[in-house]
Amino acid sequence: MGLHVTLQGLAGLLLLLYALPWAEGGKVLVFPMEGSHWLSMRDVVRELHARGHQAVVLAPEVTVHIKEEDFFTLQTYPVPYTRQGFRQQMMRNIKVVFETGNYVKTFLETSEILKNISTVLLRSCMNLLHNGSLLQHLNSSSFDMVLTDPVIPCGQVLAKYLGIPTVFFLRYIPCGIDSEATQCPKPSSYIPNLLTMLSDHMTFLQRVKNMLYPLALKYICHFSFTRYESLASELLQREVSLVEVLSHASVWLFRGDFVFDYPRPVMPNMVFIGGINCVIKKPLSQEFEAYVNASGEHGIVVFSLGSMVSEIPEKKAMEIAEALGRIPQTLLWRYTGTRPSNLAKNTILVKWLPQNDLLGHPKARAFITHSGSHGIYEGICNGVPMVMMPLFGDQMDNAKRMETRGAGVTLNVLEMTADDLENALKTVINNKSYKENIMRLSSLHKDRPIEPLDLAVFWVEYVMRHKGAPHLRPAAHDLTWYQYHSLDVIGFLLAIVLTVVFIVYKSCAYGCRKCFGGKGRVKKSHKSKTH
């Protein structure tokens, strides 16, 4: 028996040794986006490491969330700004969000914010792509692929330069660039554009708005992305458009699904991994477990305005604190600003909180969120109704979608009062329909053949195994705009129809002249002779 076991073990060892060359891990270059974008991408990098792959994360020296960890190698590059300057810029942006004003003022200030952010990101990209020694090092490192967030096109420009396939990890790209770069149909009749706060069932006037709204964003989009085209053209030594550069991605991993998003057409290389950020859960620390247990039968409310916003103006903070003190639940509020003087005993301020783990606790009663997609998905995954305070970007659209599904209440953070927040919290906690609706969405979201994290890792490995996925790239990328819409075919067929009509018309006219014109002339000449 012992010999039999030994032979089995030896056979297994030989099989393992034989398979090792084929099971060798790949090498991935990761170019992330700052903030919550990185926090969910980090889970993919961790899982790739667990499966034997090597990851190198390329990031600027000045970051907020991207730190060195044991499951990847951090490669930094210098940037022309300091950590303090970067933080001050972010604080100025947040301050503008909480300032009231008319539409024109708000639009101009928002444009200025986006302009400043775009300038910072572009300068960072320029420093990277003009760093000859670093580019040479990356080129000689034999990476199998690039994993990047295309909201900053720099990662894809780098991938094109290195000549290796790319997997995109994103929520969306502003201005509909993602639709253009994937050649995915996007009818404005039922697919709402970003920032319109419309649903997929629109009235006539809403469809007019949906069609015209992108024109208002042309200026911002032009400023934000056109300069990357110049940078890409310079590096690749040929004229390229941003859409052309992005169109060569092998696979697009969208952090969405059709429980949260409205149904729409998709292309073969578009994969949906919504909820990827709430797959990994950990037990609560003793500190937070104690807070939850002390809440009694009333439970807890989790309050966070996202990874980038932890301070708000003092007046608004006091309004919020007053409202929170009026409900019986224990409030766990992620807040690093000045402690409001009217903070009630039921409200606990923390610099950081395990949001997903707290929402997954049976005592979680409600979630106050800024409506970022990560927070929304954590609310859906854990079945917790929401009070939403959207601040900027797609957060207004996210809040609208959850509100129309009866899973939460939306408040205007600039105009709301303490009474508004109190009533909203009591509504989502005490009205059972909100809990029932969010639980239904949670059930739909979880009913899937594979977890989002496993799906994302599968496609990353797929691209590495096959050195890209060109067979998933539609031929639409190779067509001109008039070929794509078959305008040349329509023109050709129209010309044939018009030619046939013209020939038939001329033939009929000629026949009529022959049949009737001759008789008329004969009669006329005969009449003249008799006279």
Swiss-Prot record:
First-level EC class: transferase
EC number from the UniProt entry: 2.4.1.17
Organism: Rattus norvegicus (Rat)
Annotated compartments: Endoplasmic reticulum membrane
Gene that produces this protein: Ugt1a5
SUPFAM superfamilies membership: UDP-Glycosyltransferase/glycogen phosphorylase
Family according to the record: Belongs to the UDP-glycosyltransferase family.
Membrane topology: Single-pass membrane protein
Keywords assigned: Endoplasmic reticulum, Glycoprotein, Glycosyltransferase, Membrane, Signal, Transferase, Transmembrane, Transmembrane helix
GO cellular component labels: endoplasmic reticulum; endoplasmic reticulum membrane
Residue ranges crossing the lipid bilayer per the database entry: 489-505
InterPro entries in the record: UDP-glycosyltransferase (IPR050271), UDP_glucos_trans (IPR002213), UDP_glycos_trans_CS (IPR035595)
Lineage: Eukaryota, Metazoa, Chordata, Craniata, Vertebrata
Keyword Signal: yes
Chemical reaction(s) catalysed: glucuronate acceptor + UDP-alpha-D-glucuronate = acceptor beta-D-glucuronoside + UDP + H(+); zolasartan + UDP-alpha-D-glucuronate = zolarsartan-1-N-beta-D-glucuronide + UDP
Extent of the signal sequence: 1-25
Assembly and interaction partners: Homodimer. Homooligomer. Interacts with UGT1A1, UGT1A3, UGT1A4, UGT1A6, UGT1A7, UGT1A8, UGT1A9 and UGT1A10 to form heterodimers.
GO molecular function, one term: protein homodimerization activity
Sugar-modified residues: N116, N131, N139, N293, N431
GO biological-process terms attached to the record: cellular response to ethanol; cellular response to glucocorticoid stimulus; cellular response to hormone stimulus; liver development; vitamin D3 metabolic process
Role noted for this protein: UDP-glucuronosyltransferase (UGT) that catalyzes phase II biotransformation reactions in which lipophilic substrates are conjugated with glucuronic acid to increase the metabolite's water solubility, thereby facilitating excretion into either the urine or bile. Essential for the elimination and detoxification of drugs, xenobiotics and endogenous compounds. Involved in the glucuronidation of the AGTR1 angiotensin receptor antagonist zolarsatan, a drug which can inhibit the effect of angiotensin II.
Name of the protein this chain belongs to: UDP-glucuronosyltransferase 1A5
